[in-house]
Amino acid sequence: MAALQMDPELAKRLFFEGATVVILNMPKGTEFGIDCNSWEVGPKFRGVKMIPPGIHFLYYSSVDKANPKEVGPRMGFFLSLYQRGLTVLRWSTLREEVDLSPAPESEVEAMRANLQELDQFLGPYPYATLKKWISLTNFISEATVEKLQPENRQICAFSDVLPVLSMKHTKDRVGQNLPRCGTECKSYQEGLARLPEMKPRAGTEIRFSELPTQMFPAGATPAEITKHSMDLSYALQTVLNKQFPSSPQDVLGELQFAFVCFLLGNVYEAFEHWKRLLNLLCRSEAAMVKHHTLYINLISILYHQLGEIPADFFVDIVSQDNFLTSTLQVFFSSACSIAVDATLRKKAEKFQAHLTKKFRWDFAAEPEDCAPVVVELPEGTEMG
């Protein structure tokens, strides 16, 4: 890790007040990062010092000893660090990952007594990017991390999956309407259909809130179905009531958690969840009136998040549609409503102007949501 320039007084304060994370035996050449900075570690690397207290995300990619250019999948984990805290971790050579098992208290205390000698092997926290990190995570609490992180705490770019059925025997394959092993495929589609159904290994999946697929209440009339399909406030409120009953603002922590897992952890499923959750928030006009403070904070969150991603990232390769512009177009249209809080309305107008100037996104065209909506009625629903 390269030396960083820091104000001497700040460096002194962080040296005595900051937290320290020691990682023993991490192989030379491993790509390692904390929050918004990453490096290739050298042979003397033992961890990071002078870390400001709070939530942090540490991540790494192992390298192939035989071919150092071959880098493994990104893995990471969140830590909640305290003033003058010391966390001791070690590299597992067998699993090629950081072992998150807590070190014995005796080892931690011995390490604390030896910190001055260890100091030369610890890289200083990149304080220059702390402001950016806080802007991306200011709604992520320790409770958010505990609720959402996998049971094993390891966040991996690639899911650790197992087949739902082992299908070791012919009778198992017949039960799934699959041909015998070794039978030649007649088409690409048939080959895909033969692939076994997979599920995440227990304890490895991120525990995101379940988002509704049905946007209207049971027994809704056709008119109500249409209403709730255009304004998703009912569906959003069910999520807030079930997942965040004491504080609706906590949904913003989950939005930030998903974004960090995607941006720094390279977790595609987290990006998909971020999109679905953002879509639910942006298409809920009635909720903007009820939860105006939540939406004021949402704009600030999006301002910082969108600064980290190229403008064309959200464009669908096939359709050329931009998910974000179409979603925000509906949001800005709803935010213009006279019923919406004046502060929220003004902030939305400024944010729209900022995006138009920075990314040249066009929000002036009529949103697709203004076109007639065709909704699928539940089976058995009668038209009045």
From Swiss-Prot:
GO CC, alphabetical: spliceosomal complex
Instruction: Specify the domain of life of the species encoding this protein.
Output: Eukaryota
* Positions bearing N-acetylalanine: 2
Q: Would you tell me the protein name for this molecule? A: Protein AAR2 homolog
Entry's Gene Ontology BP terms: spliceosomal tri-snRNP complex assembly
**InterPro entries named in the record:** AAR2, AAR2_C, AAR2_C_sf, Aar2_N, AAR2_N_sf
| Subunit structure comment from the entry | Interacts with PRPF8 (via RNase H homology domain). Component of a U5 snRNP complex that contains PRPF8.
Q: What does this protein do?
A: Component of the U5 snRNP complex that is required for spliceosome assembly and for pre-mRNA splicing.
Q: Please indicate if the UniProt record lists Acetylation as a keyword.
A: yes
The reply on keyword Acetylation is yes
Which Pfam family, any one, appears in the UniProt record? AAR2_1st
Q: Which UniProt keywords apply?
A: Acetylation, mRNA processing, mRNA splicing, Spliceosome
Coiled coil stretches, renumbered:
none
Q: Indicate the family of this protein.
A: Belongs to the AAR2 family.
